[in-house]
Amino acid sequence: MRKKKTEVYALRRHISLSADKARRVIDQIRGRSYEETLMILELMPYRACSPISKLVYSAAANANSNMGSNKANLVISNAEVNEGTTRKKFKPRARGHCYPIKRRTCHITIGVKDISLDDEYEQIYSLKKPRWKNKYTTMIYHDIDSIGRVWDKK
């Protein structure tokens, strides 16, 4: 008996971007839903967001065409960045010297999983909770003194 396939991948190779800079963005979207991932990538100010968002769109289109899954049920289950080839050039400098220039590339793989097809989703994967929510935060009013009077700077 074959197991039903619930995960689809999209791969992009030789992106002219450092692997460390791409990992900074990939770490933020791993484990999140498809719609939340697109919102995060739209609002992040990094250059790596554009090729990663195209890759997320491609993975969702692959899931839609291969499995017929709805985009609302997709979760980024696997996201990895590997180093690619490095192009080496030389920049001519004064007095016949030269400095090496390394143009680094990377390979990015995005895997999306359809949670409606997976029975064990609740046990294995859970959506990331926002880090900024803390149940112990309290509001501090700076314009009220310890007795409760309103403090005016005038």
UniProtKB/Swiss-Prot annotation:
GO cellular component: chloroplast; large ribosomal subunit
InterPro entries: Ribosomal_uL22, Ribosomal_uL22_bac/chlpt-type, Ribosomal_uL22_bac/org-type, Ribosomal_uL22_sf
Any one Gene Ontology BP term: translation
Keyword RNA-binding listed: yes
Molecular functions (GO terms): rRNA binding; structural constituent of ribosome
Keywords: Chloroplast, Plastid, Ribonucleoprotein, Ribosomal protein, RNA-binding, rRNA-binding
Subcellular localization, as worded in the UniProt entry: Plastid, Chloroplast
Taxonomy, superkingdom: Eukaryota
Keyword Nucleus tagged: no
Complex formation: Part of the 50S ribosomal subunit.
Purpose: This protein binds specifically to 23S rRNA. The globular domain of the protein is located near the polypeptide exit tunnel on the outside of the subunit, while an extended beta-hairpin is found that lines the wall of the exit tunnel in the center of the 70S ribosome.
PANTHER family registered for this protein in UniProt: CHLOROPLAST 50S RIBOSOMAL PROTEIN L22-RELATED (PTHR13501), LARGE RIBOSOMAL SUBUNIT PROTEIN UL22M (PTHR13501:SF10)
Family membership: Belongs to the universal ribosomal protein uL22 family.
Protein name as it appears in the record: Large ribosomal subunit protein uL22c
Natural source organism: Jasminum nudiflorum (Winter jasmine)
